[in-house]
Regions:
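Residue-level recognition of pore/gate-forming positions within transmembrane alpha-helices
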Residues: 82-86, 133, 163
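Alpha-helical transmembrane segments of multi-pass membrane proteins
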Residues: 87, 134-144, 168
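Transmembrane and membrane-interface helices of multi-pass
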Residues: 103, 107-123
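Short acidic/glycine- and proline-prone juxtamembrane loop motifs at membrane-interface regions
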Residues: 127-133
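Membrane-interface transmembrane helices that cradle and orient dolichyl/undecaprenyl
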Residues: 141-154
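Membrane-interface alpha helices of multi-pass inner-membrane proteins
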Residues: 153-172
Length: 172
């Protein structure tokens, strides 16, 4: 499990550094962040994404939260974003695996390996594109564990951060 995550993060980071901005949707957020701070219309961006040309589509908070990456060199920003998202997700998988192990047969390593085996192939495309879905899925996994343990404030903070990044978290 952990070796597969390490390899995935390493490969995705190398690709992001070698081919910054290629097959990336995260640049839409960074452009919006720069436009926000320049008092420009961030919904008027026409950055090319995997889906074609479209402007920024999300809550303004996600652009503001993207600010630290918006001013880094593109390759560095792409690499940091992907490594951060995948790390948050892998850690979330580990926390969920530990929770499942408490209530079933097998240790957390087994459940983490199984989740990794099933999850990594389905998330590789999003990781390569710099999708925010990676980090919000990780935030939801962390929130799930915190909800189980009745850590209400921490779960609420994680879910609020997820909603700020992408409104899809509202479903959770």
């Amino acid at each position: 499990g952990i070796i597969a995550w390490g390899i995935l993060i390493l490969v995705v980071v190398i690709v992001a550094l070698v081919r910054p901005g290629k097959r990336s949707v995260s640049t839409v957020y960074w452009t919006a962040a720069q436009q926000w701070w320049a008092s420009q219309d961030m919904y008027g961006s026409k950055e090319l994404t995997q889906a074609g040309y479209h402007g920024f589509l999300y809550f303004p908070q996600s652009a503001v939260l993207s600010t630290p990456l918006a001013y880094l060199p593109l390759g560095v920003a792409e690499a940091v974003w992907r490594a951060l998202g995948l790390s948050v997700l892998a850690w979330g998988f580990w926390r969920v695996a530990k929770l499942v192990a408490l209530h079933s047969r097998g240790g957390p390593g087994l459940w983490f390996a199984l989740a990794s085996f099933l999850g990594i192939p389905t998330l590789t495309g999003s990781a390569q594109n710099g999708q925010f879905n990676i980090i919000i899925t990780g935030l939801m996994a962390h929130a799930l564990v915190d909800l189980f343990y009745r850590r209400w404030w921490r779960a609420a903070l994680l879910l609020a951060l997820g909603i700020a990044l992408k409104p899809h978290v509202l479903v959770f």
